[in-house]
């Protein structure tokens, strides 16, 4: 049985992603480019740490009036799902990445964004709705070291 894909595009061009995956083009490029190590070897504790960080940032940015309450609640709901291990298969990256952890950060952003879209009744790839909100939740490497 052939695997089905969806095609997403961004500033780097088009990329084929497994049809029902919650990740997006940045994660898929990392999968394609870092064929070293065991797939999905990113420790759950790191994924959970990012979920806690993004949940906290969503709450803070709502309090600062930078993020509307509806979007904050969507981000919180998805982060809680991640913390309950409901989406472990959506974090396929290996631990071998560039030093800043950008790939893992983008993987989390894409999963939160796409899952939030589904929860709000939008299409899987209509990620502009939530993606802009996640800009407020992206740490620089100095913030997590």
Language-model region placement:
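Active-site catalytic microenvironments for nucleophilic, acid-base chemistry
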Residues: 63, 115, 119, 140
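Mid-sequence acidic-hydrophobic segments that form the walls
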Residues: 81-85, 114-122
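Generic N-terminal targeting/processing segments that precede catalytic cores or assembly contacts
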Residues: 2-94, 107-110
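Helix-loop-helix junctions within predominantly alpha-helical proteins
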Residues: 107, 120, 125-130
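Single conserved hydrophobic/aromatic residue that forms the stacking wall/gate
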Residues: 136-145
